[in-house]
């Protein structure tokens, strides 16, 4: 043999083994320094097989190296270190480098103050106190950090990257999953191509979501904390943002996006949950909260323009501080409210509540139910009010209350089933009551006031001329300034 190794019989293994030249057998007085390294020699029927030991050695500081080009520090700085593999290099005390071109370099302060590093795998690099790099082409730089997987990369202290091409670029980062990336301080990234911190591609940049094409300048300049992305291709950026679910995206400070997306690859995830406004919240499949303090909850819910609320399926709140709740409810006016199914609210400070209700006038109120294939509840005049099934208030300050009632002139008021007030400032009170003249008033079932400034009071009472008056059941005033008082009374002027 040579000056470094010798062959002895191992009673425990029941075979010949290669050990250090200074090793002793069981009966020796000195302790064996290195036991059973490299290989055993097995006896064969036709004779024995020879074994050629690779280059290697043990230093006076108990540092072990094995392999062509393997190196350790022979001084006290390299005590108890191990380098195994071609061109492997274990640079500091208690560091371990195993694999071709692997490098392990811990932190050495003094003979009694040091922390090793561990690098296992071809072309791995572990640099820093207590660092661990496992895989092929894995790189870990930063004290107490861990990188596991092919081409995993850790850049700063106290971080973890686990998975093929995973990245942990700042301190306190946890990235787990193939191509997962944590680019902000304290970021959490869990899932395939999940990204926390530094929006390096956005909606139209790097649509393939590949770490190899991430914008390095953006990563390095990102200085915000606490983003968390969990799920397939989830993205959280902006500082304290949270994205949970497939393709969920929280892209502003303190934004929250929870929900799934579609698509089989990174380029066709067009339907995804997104919270892009500061302190915005989007929850549900394809829900979107676009501006500051927006809240969107439900499948395809959409809130935009700031402080907007959209809750339900396919609901929209596109006006500032607007509220839309229900099913296919749409609110586009500022500070407006829409609650119910198939709601349309397009004016400022308007309110629409019910089924098939439209409030399109500023400050208008529509409450009730439309009919399938029939009329909707419509409050289209400014400050108009429509309450009841199929009611209509389409003029400024018009009021329609009661099923099928209509207030269709400025200041007109219709109260009662199928009542109509079509004259300016006219009033119709009662079922089927009608006031069609300007300033006309009809009170009673089927009462009718068609003359300007006319008044009809009583069931079927009728005042048909200007300033006429009919009071009583079926009373009729037909002439200008005429008066009919009493049941069945008539007056022609």
Task: List PLM regions with ranges.
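Glycine- and small/polar-enriched repetitive beta-structure motifs of secreted/surface proteins
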Residues: 4, 9-13, 17-24, 32-41, ...
């Amino acid at each position: 043999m040579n000056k470094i190794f010798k062959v002895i019989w191992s009673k425990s293994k029941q075979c010949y083994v290669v050990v250090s030249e200074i090793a002793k057998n069981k009966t020796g007085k000195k302790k064996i320094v290195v036991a059973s390294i490299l290989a055993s020699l097995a006896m064969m029927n036709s004779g024995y097989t020879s074994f050629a030991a690779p280059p290697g050695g043990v230093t006076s500081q108990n540092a072990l190296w094995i392999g062509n080009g393997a190196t350790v520090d022979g001084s006290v700085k390299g005590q108890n270190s191990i380098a195994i593999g071609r061109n492997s290099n274990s640079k500091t005390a208690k560091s371990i480098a195993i694999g071709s071109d692997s490098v392990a370099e811990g932190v050495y302060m003094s003979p009694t103050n040091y922390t090793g590093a561990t690098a296992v795998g071809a072309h791995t690099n572990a640099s820093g106190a207590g660092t661990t790099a496992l895989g092929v082409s894995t790189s870990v730089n930063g004290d107490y950090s861990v990188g596991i997987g092919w081409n995993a990369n850790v850049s700063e202290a106290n971080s973890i990257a686990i998975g093929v091409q995973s990245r942990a670029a700042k301190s306190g980062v946890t990235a787990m999953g193939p191509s997962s990336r944590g680019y902000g301080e304290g970021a959490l990234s869990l899932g395939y191509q999940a990204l926390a911190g530094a929006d390096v591609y956005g909606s139209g940049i790097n649509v393939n979501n590949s770490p190899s094409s991430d914008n390095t300048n953006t990563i390095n300049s990102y200085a915000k904390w606490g983003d968390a992305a969990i799920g397939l291709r989830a993205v959280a950026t902006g500082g304290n943002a949270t994205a949970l679910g497939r393709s969920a995206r929280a892209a502003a400070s303190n934004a929250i996006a929870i929900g799934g997306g579609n698509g089989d690859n990174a380029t066709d995830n067009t339907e995804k949950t997104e919270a892009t406004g500061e302190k915005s919240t989007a929850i549900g499949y394809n829900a979107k909260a676009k501006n500051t303090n927006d809240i969107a909850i439900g499948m395809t819910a959409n809130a935009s323009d700031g402080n907007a609320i959209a809750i339900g399926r396919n609901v929209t709140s596109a006006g500032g501080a607007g509220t839309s709740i229900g099913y296919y409810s749409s609110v586009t006016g500022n500070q407006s409210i829409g609650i119910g199914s198939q709601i349309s609210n397009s004016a400022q400070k308007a309110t629409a509540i019910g089924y098939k209700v439209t409030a399109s006038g500023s400050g208008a109120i529509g409450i009730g139910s439309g009919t399938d294939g029939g009329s909707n509840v419509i409050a289209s005049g400014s400050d108009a009010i429509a309450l009841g099934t199929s009611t209509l208030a389409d003029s400024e300050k018009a009021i329609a209350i009661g099923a099928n009632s209509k207030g269709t002139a400025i200041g007109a008021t219709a109260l009662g089933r199928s009542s109509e007030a079509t004259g300016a400032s006219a009033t119709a009170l009662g079922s089927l009551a009608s006031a069609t003249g300007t300033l006309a008033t009809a009170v009673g079932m089927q009462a009718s006031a068609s003359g300007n400034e006319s008044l009809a009071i009583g069931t079927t009472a009728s005042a048909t001329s200007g300033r006429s008056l009919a009071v009583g059941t079926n009373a009729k005033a037909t002439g200008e300034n005429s008066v009919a008082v009493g049941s069945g009374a008539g007056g022609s002027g």
